[in-house]
Amino acid sequence: MTLNGGSGAGGSRSAGRERDRRRGSTPWGPAPPLHRRSMPVDERDLQAALTPGSLAATAAGTRTQGQRLDWPEGSSDSLSSGDSGSEDGVYKVHAAGAPGVGKSALARIFGGVEDGPEAEAAGHTYDRSITVDGEEASLMVYDIWEQDGGCWLPGHCMAMGDAYVIVYSITDKGSFEKASELRVQLRARRQTDVPIILVGNKSDLVRSREVSVDEGRACAEVFDCKFIETSAALHHNVQALFEGVVRQIRLRRDSKEDNARRQAGTRRRESLGKKAKLFLGRIVARNSRKMAFLAKSKSCHDLSVL
C-alpha cells in the first residue's frame, strides 16, 4: 500500500523510502486521518438521528481531507464502474452478528483505529476512500447493530445499506447459527439483490475451531451469499473482505443481465424458510461433516464474481 502525499523531489524521495520500508509488512499500514462519527446510544436519539434521509445526509458529510489511500495494485480484476455508488457517492456497509464475534474489530481495522483512547473516541462509524481495481470508492462501515440492546435498531439497519457483512466466530457454533438466522431475516426484509458476505472471523484460533470451512461455504451456498474467513487479530483477509464488498456492489449495479439472472434464480430456489429449517437442522446433527457434499460450490468464496 502506498500513501499519496509529499511534494517536490524531497517528497518523492521520502515517499520512495517509506514504500521500501513497508514493502515486507502488512499492506494496510498507518491509516490516513479519518472523519469519525459517534452514534448516539439512546434509542430516542438513534431514532432522531436515523430518520429517513438523515442518515444519507450524515454519510454525505465532509470526509477525509488529506492523503488518499491507495491499496496494492495486485488486486484481482472485476467489473468496475465510473460513477456507480449510492446516491451520495458513499457505499454504506453494515456489520452484523452475535456479540463477541469480532465485527467491531474488523470495522476498526478498516477505519485504522484499533487500540487505546483513539479507538474509544472513534465512535461507531468509519469512512474511508479506497482504490479497488484502479477506481476509488468511498465506504462507510456502520458498527451500530447492538447499541440499543433491543430490536428497533437492527430492524432499521436491515432496511437500509448497500451491503451487509454478517460475522460469526469459527470458535462458536451458536454465533454461526445466529449468522444464518440473520441472513434469512435480512433477505426477508430486503427483497433486492443486496450483497451479503458471510464472514468467519478468528480463523487464527485453529485449536478452538467449532465451525469448519466447509460448513461456512455450505451455508453461503444455501443462502446465496459470499463467504470469507478472516482473522482480526492477524489482519488476515480483512483487506480482501472490504475490497470484496466494493466489487460485489459494483458487479450488481453494473451487470445488465442481473434482472434476468435474479428472476431465473427465484424460480429455482426453494423458500428461504424451508432452507433455513433444513440447514439449521443439519448443523446440529452429529454427522455435520457431510454438509460439504450437500451443495456444489458456485464460487461463493470468490468475492470478485457474482
UniProtKB/Swiss-Prot annotation:
<keyword id="KW-0547">Nucleotide-binding</keyword>
<comment type="subunit">
    <text>Interacts with Calmodulin preferentially in the inactive, GDP-bound form. Interacts with CAMK2D. Interacts with CACNB2; interaction may be involved in beta-adrenergic regulation of heart rate and contractile force. Interaction with CACNB2 regulates the trafficking of CACNA1C to the cell membrane.</text>
</comment>
<comment type="function">
    <text>May regulate basal voltage-dependent L-type Ca(2+) currents and be required for beta-adrenergic augmentation of Ca(2+) influx in cardiomyocytes, thereby regulating increases in heart rate and contractile force. May play an important role in cardiac antiarrhythmia via the strong suppression of voltage-dependent L-type Ca(2+) currents. Regulates voltage-gated L-type calcium channel subunit alpha-1C trafficking to the cell membrane. Inhibits cardiac hypertrophy through the calmodulin-dependent kinase II (CaMKII) pathway. Inhibits phosphorylation and activation of CAMK2D.</text>
</comment>
<feature type="modified residue" description="Phosphoserine">
    <location>
        <position position="25"/>
    </location>
</feature>
<feature type="binding site">
    <location>
        <begin position="97"/>
        <end position="104"/>
    </location>
    <ligand>
        <name>GTP</name>
    </ligand>
</feature>
<feature type="region of interest" description="Disordered">
    <location>
        <begin position="1"/>
        <end position="91"/>
    </location>
</feature>
<keyword id="KW-0472">Membrane</keyword>
<dbReference type="GO" id="GO:0005246">
    <property type="term" value="F:calcium channel regulator activity"/>
</dbReference>
<dbReference type="InterPro" id="IPR027417">
    <property type="entry name" value="P-loop_NTPase"/>
</dbReference>
<feature type="modified residue" description="Omega-N-methylarginine">
    <location>
        <position position="23"/>
    </location>
</feature>
<protein>
    <recommendedName>
        <fullName>GTP-binding protein RAD</fullName>
    </recommendedName>
</protein>
<feature type="compositionally biased region" description="Low complexity">
    <location>
        <begin position="56"/>
        <end position="88"/>
    </location>
</feature>
<dbReference type="GO" id="GO:0030315">
    <property type="term" value="C:T-tubule"/>
</dbReference>
<comment type="similarity">
    <text>Belongs to the small GTPase superfamily. RGK family.</text>
</comment>
<dbReference type="GO" id="GO:0005886">
    <property type="term" value="C:plasma membrane"/>
</dbReference>
<keyword id="KW-0112">Calmodulin-binding</keyword>
<dbReference type="GO" id="GO:0003924">
    <property type="term" value="F:GTPase activity"/>
</dbReference>
<dbReference type="InterPro" id="IPR017358">
    <property type="entry name" value="RGK"/>
</dbReference>
<dbReference type="InterPro" id="IPR001806">
    <property type="entry name" value="Small_GTPase"/>
</dbReference>
<dbReference type="Pfam" id="PF00071">
    <property type="entry name" value="Ras"/>
</dbReference>
<feature type="region of interest" description="Calmodulin-binding">
    <location>
        <begin position="276"/>
        <end position="295"/>
    </location>
</feature>
<keyword id="KW-0342">GTP-binding</keyword>
<dbReference type="InterPro" id="IPR051641">
    <property type="entry name" value="RGK_GTP-binding_reg"/>
</dbReference>
<keyword id="KW-0597">Phosphoprotein</keyword>
<dbReference type="GO" id="GO:0005525">
    <property type="term" value="F:GTP binding"/>
</dbReference>
<keyword id="KW-1003">Cell membrane</keyword>
<feature type="binding site">
    <location>
        <begin position="201"/>
        <end position="204"/>
    </location>
    <ligand>
        <name>GTP</name>
    </ligand>
</feature>
<keyword id="KW-0488">Methylation</keyword>
<dbReference type="GO" id="GO:0030308">
    <property type="term" value="P:negative regulation of cell growth"/>
</dbReference>
<feature type="compositionally biased region" description="Gly residues">
    <location>
        <begin position="1"/>
        <end position="13"/>
    </location>
</feature>
<dbReference type="GO" id="GO:0005516">
    <property type="term" value="F:calmodulin binding"/>
</dbReference>
